[in-house]
Amino acid sequence: PYPSSWDELQNNEGWELVKETDRVLVYSKLLPDSPIPALKAEILSDVKMEKLVDAAWLVEKSTVVFPNAFIIDAGVYHRRSDSSYTAFQVFDVPFLSPRLYQFNSIRFGNSIHWVRTDTLRTELNPENHLLPPVNFGSWVVTQGENKSKLTYRVCTDPGGHVPHWIINQANQRYLPQMLEDIESFAGKK
């Protein structure tokens, strides 16, 4: 099931521009599900729409698709169909304990939705990594006149004792790089 703030994360109202690079716009807004602002990042790309969404769907290749995102392991626990799986990513950010993100993903054409799952067996976390209490979001690719527009939305709380301002700064720094990395990977396919 989708979290109560899912629709609010997906709509375009109430977002505040917090970071602008030459290629990526990053917006934030507060949602009731997390004390940390949700984020939306957008990039316009010459890469074909299908290649971008295909790259986002390759969770098991996250360490290659996102080489700058501190992902040290990723994979699929269970693939229900070509458009649905339960997966994981382990993030090991410097100075923090590793986090194990476990989530259900569904692909709807040119969009991917994911929502944290907490119904997995404890043996799927053998190293006892921290499990973030909030994690849901989406990838959406739309086709413009000459460019594809990739939009990434995420509401997350990594848990643990990390000051929120540090998380906000890190997100604003690494989200633009993440979108440029997925574009680079998709462009080589």
State the predicted function of each range:
Residues 1-189:
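Eukaryotic helix-grip
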